[in-house]
């Protein structure tokens, strides 16, 4: 029997789990607009207070994938998404977007799923627009860009139109809900490999196991002890790794990869223009903490994409494509191709 919204709310009040299949049914009702805003807000609050389980998150993500506009990709080999949940409050330049160009230059197919700013001063969509890229591409155009340039950016609002149903509720609530952790789990291109940053240490193991349940091949879920939702230079980073069907949790430090520690304040920016400037300095191979953190995260992406035998090997590969200019060339090629696809000069 499907669970009713009222029964679901009662479960959360009693700190009892909504089982996977029940969550699937409930989310379908919510995404179809069949549940009132008041009840949606109550259920989201109840889940947050109770703390969402692996089964609840996986069930909800399954439905979000069902309702998304998919990007049809025939070859998923070496494909990776580099994504964060946002909400870490670090206000750094857009590290994951910069790492995308480096990983693509290193041979990965980066299917990046992103949105406008949540925690940083510049979300991935903001950063790409500041770099001159056209971000509002249709699914078939994203697939084309991915095939031609090794990069496909999927602007979340275009791929998840059903999210409009819950947008007013989320906006009025103004607090984190399960939807904040669903976005990174619902890549419309179905990337089997993912480097995911999270905003809380508890999510490292949880999200890795959700990805396991959702059928991902390989994943690294990371949280820096300084609060960053990236592999950090300022502290150790907790890692949940999914590989060969198993999840392993461990901790890494920048010095493990021959990188000097550096506080996250050295990576802070005030707006999209500053983020763009710092990102371009990295792609121009200007030494410093920004270059180091991008090399570290791009190296992790190359590892999870199956293009490096370890994160350390991936970092070396990332540094090589930064040094020879191919990472910067990949940015220029991607921006130009998005204009071609959109019919813009």
Swiss-Prot record:
Signal peptide: none
Enzyme class: transferase
Residues reported in the UniProt entry to bind Mg(2+) 1: 96, 230
Positions annotated to bind anthranilate 1: 84, 115
GO molecular function, one term: anthranilate phosphoribosyltransferase activity
Record-listed 5-phospho-alpha-D-ribose 1-diphosphate binding positions: 84, 87-88, 92, 94-97, 112-120, 124
Co-factor requirement: Mg(2+)
Alphabetized InterPro entries for the sequence: Anthranilate_Pribosyl_Tfrase (IPR005940), Glycosyl_Trfase_fam3 (IPR000312), Glycosyl_Trfase_fam3_N_dom (IPR017459), Glycosyl_Trfase_fam3_N_dom_sf (IPR036320), Nuc_phospho_transferase (IPR035902)
Pathway assigned in UniProt: Amino-acid biosynthesis; L-tryptophan biosynthesis; L-tryptophan from chorismate: step 2/5
Binding site for anthranilate 2: 170
Catalysed reactions, as listed in the record: N-(5-phospho-beta-D-ribosyl)anthranilate + diphosphate = 5-phospho-alpha-D-ribose 1-diphosphate + anthranilate
Similarity comment: Belongs to the anthranilate phosphoribosyltransferase family.
Matching HAMAP family: TrpD
UniProt name for this protein: Anthranilate phosphoribosyltransferase
Chain's gene name: trpD
